[in-house]
């Protein structure tokens, strides 16, 4: 029973909005019971411990999520000195002189998906990631969720291509601030 609960919980976390479906890594916590909307802050200590958990699951999903989380840590939190920064903020500023908005870097609308991917891949991505016109977050935006990882090799290749293209598009958005404080204990969890 405990293994079933672990498998179900880790699958729900990895498929929900708490997990960054494009860039890897986990948000600090979810603000709803369905794990759709995260508090978008990404902490080193959470990701270090979750990386270890997913790596020990011994499943294809665990291996994928552990690898993507490790990539996130190395790409987003590694400092020039070789340690890891403490966190990425939940907020980023959209317009010059504007105010910080939670989740702005991470959320999408169907229109944005079509603009980045074209009509076919945009519609496919909206369906695959649960992005709706009503939105799952604020102002008609949605967090990306991947409740069912494709099993068909063609769909897996399409998903990889869509994720790569959306990640590249997201990199053009205003980024959340990074807390460059290097905490030895948190770094110890990550290495």
Predicted stretch roles:
Residues 1-191:
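Glycan-recognition and catalytic cores of secretory/periplasmic carbohydrate-active enzymes
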């Amino acid at each position: 029973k405990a293994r079933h609960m672990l498998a179900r919980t880790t699958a729900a976390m990895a498929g929900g909005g708490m997990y960054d479906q494009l860039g890897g890594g986990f948000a600090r916590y979810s603000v709803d019971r369905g794990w759709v909307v995260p508090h978008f802050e990404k902490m080193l200590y959470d990701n270090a411990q979750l990386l270890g958990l997913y790596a020990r699951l011994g499943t294809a999903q665990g291996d994928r999520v552990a690898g993507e989380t490790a990539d996130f840590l190395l790409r987003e939190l590694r400092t020039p000195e070789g340690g890891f920064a403490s966190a990425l903020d939940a907020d980023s500023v959209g317009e010059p002189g504007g105010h910080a908005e939670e989740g702005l870097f991470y959320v999408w609308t169907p229109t944005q998906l079509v603009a980045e991917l074209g009509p076919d891949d945009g519609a496919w991505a909206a369906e695959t990631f649960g992005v709706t016109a009503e939105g799952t977050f604020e102002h008609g935006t949605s967090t990306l969720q991947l409740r069912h990882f494709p099993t068909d090799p063609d769909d897996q290749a399409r998903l990889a291509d869509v994720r790569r293209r959306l990640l590249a598009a997201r990199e053009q958005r205003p980024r959340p601030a990074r807390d460059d404080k290097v905490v030895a204990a948190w770094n110890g969890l990550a290495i």
